[in-house]
Structures are given as C-alpha cells and as structure tokens.
UniProtKB/Swiss-Prot annotation:
Name of the gene this protein is made from: TSGA13
Reported tissue expression: Testis-specific.
Region: Disordered, residue numbers: 1-28
InterPro entries xref list: TSGA13
Segments forming a coiled coil: none
Pfam families listed in its UniProt record: TSGA13
Polar residues composition bias: residue spans: 1-20
Highest taxon listed in the record's lineage: Eukaryota
Residue spans crossing the bilayer: none
Protein's name in the database: Testis-specific gene 13 protein
C-alpha cells in the first residue's frame, strides 16, 4: 500500500509541475501582477497602468524662457558682424571689378603707360600731348605735376635767439625756448572756475557769488583773524582724575560688568549740582 501511495504522490507532483510549466508557456496571469511570455521572462505591470499610457500635453503649463540682456547683446553683435562681413565682401568684389577694368598706371613698366588713358578724358590728353610736342617733343608723355606751395612760417610764432655754449657769438634762431618765472605772472584760476561750474551743475537753484567777491571775503577773513588777540594761557588736556572730580560715577544695579542696560530704573545715590 505504501508503495502505491508513493507512486501516486510522485505522479501528482509531475502533473502539477507540467501544468505550471504549461501555464507559463501559454502566458497566464498570476495574482494579477505577473505576466509571463513565451520565453519565460516575467514582467511586473502596474495595476493602474491604463491611466498612465496617455501622457498629457504639459507644454501648455510652461512659459518659454525670456532672453537675458547678455543673450540679446550677443545676438545683436552677431547680426552686426554678419552684416559687416557681407558689406566687406561686396566692397572687395566691387574693388576687384574696378581694378580689373581700370588697372592703375605704373612708372616701372612700359606697358602700363598705355592704361593711364582710361583715367582721363581725351581732350585733356590731347592738350597735354600738344604742349609736350611743342616744348619737349623728345620726352615721354607724362602729366604735369601739381604746383606745390611753399610752406611759409606763420608770423604769429615768435623767434627766440639761440646761444651756443661753444660759440656764444653765433647768431641762430629757433621757434621755441624753455619757460621762465617771468612767463607766469598771472594767478591760475582754471581750478576755481571749474569748481564753480560743478557747484552750479549740482545745485542749480542756488546763486553763487563771483570769484573775485569770494576772494575779497577770504582776504578780509584772513585779516580779521590776524588782527584778533591771541591768548597766551597754556592749556592742558583733561585727565581721568579731573573728569571724575566734575562728573562723579553713578552706580546702577545689574548683573554684568557693564550692566548692559538691564536695570529698569537708574537710581542715583551720589550727585553734585554744578551751579
């Protein structure tokens, strides 16, 4: 009997294992949480997954970031740089076109002399050719030079004598010299006028006296101060002992050394009345 029961129990175990493996292969749901695929790898799925499958459009709840002052400055700088680059390229193309059509004359080579006619009208060139053939027919064809005006010395600049240490009798002249004390006789008033202007800008509602009147007042105050009698009494600085004689110490209740203002009422025990 025992052998029959053991065989039945083993057969039951094998059947349950086969059933469980068959369920896993078919993809059965266990406890509403585990789903197995054909391979046998389990995946855990949320119970309320259907509520999260469709994501809401959250862009409507956010505002776009505003550009800062630095970003605006950099963007404007890029625009200006690109515009200047385009203008420079356009100028280069125009210059190349002009130089190709009208090459400049060169005095080194003979071939470039013929290109000078592109810069001047035919009438002017005919006049130049006639004048050159009449006076100097053998010379090459060149345009006349512009008349140069001589640089005349301005009469406003004075001339100072120059005395050399080697030869004191030599007579030379120069337009400059070192300044001496005799050149600075007037008092400088630039700083005073500048200070008055700044004061007028800062306080436009006030009226300021002229500079010469203020100078007169200062001179008068200096004279009055000098005329005052000066006392010859020798004064000494106050000491702590002399201060304690006139102002006695006042004791007040409290815990700390400096009282810290904890006393609700200051009770003066000793006081002297100074008449």
């Amino acid at each position: 009997m025992s052998q029959k029961r053991q065989t039945k129990f083993q057969n039951g175990k094998s059947k349950t294992s086969e059933n469980s493996s068959a369920k896993r292969e078919k993809g059965m749901v266990v406890n509403s949480k585990e789903i197995s695929d054909a391979v046998g790898q389990s995946k855990f799925v949320l119970e309320n997954l259907r509520h999260y499958t469709v994501h809401p459009n959250l862009a409507q709840y956010y505002k776009p970031l505003k550009a800062t002052a630095l970003q605006k400055f950099l963007a404007q700088n890029r625009k200006n740089t690109s515009f200047m680059l385009k203008v420079t390229q356009y100028d280069q193309d125009k210059t190349l076109l002009i130089m190709t059509n009208n090459p400049p004359p060169c005095s080194i080579t003979q071939q470039d002399k013929e290109s000078a006619s592109k810069y001047f009208s035919k009438e002017l060139l005919l006049k130049v050719m006639e004048s050159h053939h009449q006076h100097k027919p053998t010379e090459n064809l060149w345009l006349p030079r512009m008349p140069q005006k001589k640089k005349l010395r301005s009469k406003l600049k004075p001339i100072f004598p120059l005395i050399l240490s080697d030869d004191p009798t030599s007579k030379r002249e120069q337009w400059f010299r070192f300044s001496t004390d005799n050149d600075f006789k007037s008092e400088g008033k630039y700083s005073k006028v500048y200070a008055l202007r700044t004061q007028k800008k800062m306080y436009p509602q006030l009226t300021f006296a002229p500079v010469h009147e203020r100078d007169m007042r200062k001179d008068a105050s200096k004279k009055s101060a000098s005329e005052r009698p000066i006392s010859k009494v020798i004064r000494e600085p106050l000491t702590l002992a002399s201060l304690l004689e006139d102002m006695p110490t006042r004791t007040a209740p409290g815990e700390s050394a400096f009282r810290n203002g904890r006393a609700p009422q200051w009770i003066i025990k000793k006081a002297t009345v100074i008449g």
